[in-house]
Swiss-Prot record:
Residues 9-254 form the ATP-grasp domain. This is Succinate--CoA ligase [ADP-forming] subunit beta. Belongs to the succinate/malate CoA ligase beta subunit family. It is an enzyme of class 6 (ligase). GO terms for molecular function: ATP binding; magnesium ion binding; succinate-CoA ligase (ADP-forming) activity; succinate-CoA ligase (GDP-forming) activity. One of its GO terms (biological process) is tricarboxylic acid cycle. Its EC number is 6.2.1.5. The keyword Acyltransferase does not apply.
Amino acid sequence: MNIHEYQAKALLRSYGAPVSDGRVVLKADEAKSAAGELGGPLWVVKAQIHAGGRGKGKFKEPEAGEKGGVRLAKSVGEAAELAKQMLGRTLVTHQTGPSGKQVNRIYIEEGSDIARELYLALLVDRGTSRISFVVSTEGGMDIEEVAASTPEKIVSFSVDPASGLSDFHGRRVAFALGLEGAQVKQCVQLVKNLYRAFVEKDMEMLEINPLIVMTDGNLKVLDAKVGFDNNALYRQPDIMALRDETEEDPKELAASKFDLNYIALDGEIGCMVNGAGLAMATMDIIKLYGAEPANFLDVGGGATKEKVTEAFKIITSDPNVKGILVNIFGGIMRCDIIAEGIIAAVKEVGLQVPLVVRLEGTNVEKGKEIIANSGLNVIAGDNLSDAAQKIVKAVKG
């Protein structure tokens, strides 16, 4: 789960991280009073969406102006006008895709005198099962370009969970960032605070870009992006309260309410599978035979007719889907239950695209019999390869 920048900064502030004072604005008429509560003489007006690249982004609507989603104002009135221009508009960045995201929140914060822009992130390194630090002296809007063209400017290391974080980790970050004097001590404390927040709040990713050195020599968190482990949210009610469902894919949101693991992709063949490994194998074989999967959808081991029906609704709500492949291995899940769910779903949604079903495992013969006697136009797949070839042929011809 992701949260907005202003929420991330409030969380980090509670852990002692140095951040600018700011105000969130939901309505245009709130902007002037919000900006007036801040000191100036420079105000930063930021669009709040769950995507990076806001500074280099562009709005679809000409009324929003030609600048990106991060703008500078030199007066309260100008800050209010910039907020008014961006609220309700659609911001397109390299992370949103061409459809962009609607800006429903604006964050106005005090400007900072910047001497240097740095990069600092904490990530879960799944290869080592440790928390890793990733740091660079080249922070700011071009960090992706730095990673691609000059990777030697990025330093990373992990923390052994058995021994935990120590001061030397903070000093290692400081030296990698080229900090000196009192800045090293500040960095050591900041690293401690960020690491504690990361662990206590079950984060998956914490990105500070940029971490700035101000002209007075002090450090400040200028932007923050935080992602949390969805599997740990049950023990983080305060984090769950920060969830903004308007920022989530509607199909993924609907799937989560039925405990379906769904991720939208860009292809034309919808997939419904039980088990993450089998789902990935199904997507691979669709690509092998010349097509592209439209989604990852794992119905899990305890799917009911209701869950299967909802899964079909979610898949068919994607206008790019030109065919559907159902691939079920019945272990915990019985194939006859899945078959009943498929029939009910096809009847309820009025399926208009080809459907190939491959069943194997517990009660597979009952499942096949239910589908065969349904009177519906469902194509049976004898095995995974056969099913994949049939759905690709049905879609591509």
